[in-house]
């Protein structure tokens, strides 16, 4: 599809489309089907060259593939991105220099040197870690050396650096750490099992057996002494893995987040055997087998609420777990549905409202974020009734939650605009729709400072490498015009970095000097451009249209 004066698919025909029939403003669209619909409306009266049914109804290959995902190579001089292969479901990876020149498809052994999206950087900005094909890699940014930390059929995820160079990552609910020169070691293990060292429940018969039969008593004392000695050796030996932490048999581990220094673990659990409700079954009649098949869908609305969560703070060295109660959250006992319950003649709510620690938007892990120095942690707690969202910290010394922000809405808390994290100096930043629009706030322990304001939205905030500037997506001109914007962490004017009229997403270069932008328009599938972080004209890197 050409943006202006080119080939446009129109109601089953292909021909140049008059610009006066086109919408006057660009629209942010990620769906080519939606673009085709708009084009059909604009050009329905024009008909010359027939289009095949495949082109008109489904397959956008004839238009050209959109850039689906893009990231920086380690040196900041090249970008890597994925394109759909024509006529197939395969996604190929290409590499292109930003200084000019064509793209090269990376195939075969060349793929072993690929970088990956969502890389995380150490405090000195000399190394980055990322996950590729489920394995963890570390790249030295001084010379490009790539070190593979894991090579397994399991999926590792969520790497994070500590301020002193320790890297932690997870494999399911097991946590590992890596430090240069020491290799990979297990950092924390939590099990939903009975602690073998825990005393059994009181039982008169058992007590009489031990009191009357000296052999049984001696055997028990021998076992206990051997176990205690082994645990003492484990704690004193730095080459040993940490002992498991046992949460008991009444819970199921749903998620967890380890502090970068490996000392603390936050664990999210649900009740074992809890009824999630029967899921709906969607019948599929056109199948390879020739027989009808059923696909499991979500639990039907109104059947069962999402399972409530419990939260535990684990001292990894001591293998001790303490439940963090939610009763310190303001409004947790208030029932926003009290009037409806009364009208329906239902019993009033008793105790605290059920809550969940929801996953991050990208599905990478729970909405729990540690600061790089492991001194601070924040988590997003959401009421199951969707009327409240809290961002809470944890008092690690006293094992209790401390509320940092509360957002309440009688209608519904948005599933989006819930990003949060920490600045370089340990202040909490977060998005909130308290004003009616998503805006950026910073809280350093007192009253929150609002960095952005107006009848527009902030999304996907990212800190610059020096920690001085937030970059984010904004739509200040009108709701459909998305750009990359920036604002100082200390406060100040918001500036627009791009003028592309349709930013989909962006990524800062490793040194923070440039921004890789994926953008589209009504008649152009997502493409890549690069712009200086200080602003200026964008340099377009790709044009995948035919």
Summary of predicted features, one role per range:
Residues 2, 18, 25-28:
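Basic polycationic patches enriched in arginine
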Residues 31-42:
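Bacterial N-terminal signal peptides
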Residues 45-505, 513-514, 520-526, 531:
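Beta-propeller folds
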Residues 312, 540-546:
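N-terminal cap/lid segment of alpha/beta-hydrolase-fold proteins
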Residues 528, 538-541:
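Blade-level signature of beta-propeller repeat domains, shared across WD40, Kelch, NHL, RCC1
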